[in-house]
C-alpha cells in the first residue's frame, strides 16, 4: 500500500500557477473537465434551476467573467502554462436567494443572485468570481480527487491514474460533486482557501479591478454572515482571518493592477 502511494506521488506532480505550490496530480484536465462540463449542463438544464439570460445582472456576470478569463488566459500563456489549460469558459447567473458562487473544473462558473446584494459593485463581483476561479486554476478539485485515489491505492484508482479513466474518474467526481447534477460545493482546507484568495486577488487586478476593494466585499460578507457563514463558506477561514490575509496579499496583487 505504502509503495503504491509513493509510486503514484512520484508519477504525477504539478505546480500551481503564480503560487508555485507543488501538488499531487493523478487526474488530468482531459479526465475531469468533460465530466464537470456534463454536470454543469445537467444543472443548468434542470427545471428547478432558474438561469437568468437577460437583464443588467446577467450581463454583468458575463462581462466581468469574460474580462477575468481573458486576463487569466493571457497570464497562463505568457508564463508557460498555456498548454496545460484549455478552459472553455462559461458564466451564468442563477436566480436564487442562496448566497453562493462557484467555478467547476474547466471554467464553468455560476453566480447566484442572492450574492449580488453583497457584492454590490463590479469589483465586489470580480472578487468572488476571481476567488472561485482561483480554485479551478489551482486544480483544487483534481487535487482532492488525486488524494482520494492515493488513499484508495487500489487497482481501480491506479488504473484511472494511468489511463483507464472513464468509470473510476466519473465515480470519484460524482462523490465530490453529487449525483444527477445536484452540485455539492467542495469544501476546501484553509490552505486552499488562502491560495484561492491569493489567485483571485491577482486575477481581478489583471482584469482591471482594484484588489483593495476585496476587503470591502469580505467585510460586507462578514456582516451578512452575522457569525454564521453560508454553506459555501462553512470551511473557509474566519472573517477576521480572511480579511487580515487579504490585506497582507494586496501589495502583491497591486503589482498587476493598472486600472481601467
Predicted regions and their residues:
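A Zn2+-metalloprotease active-site environment signal
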Residues: 1-260
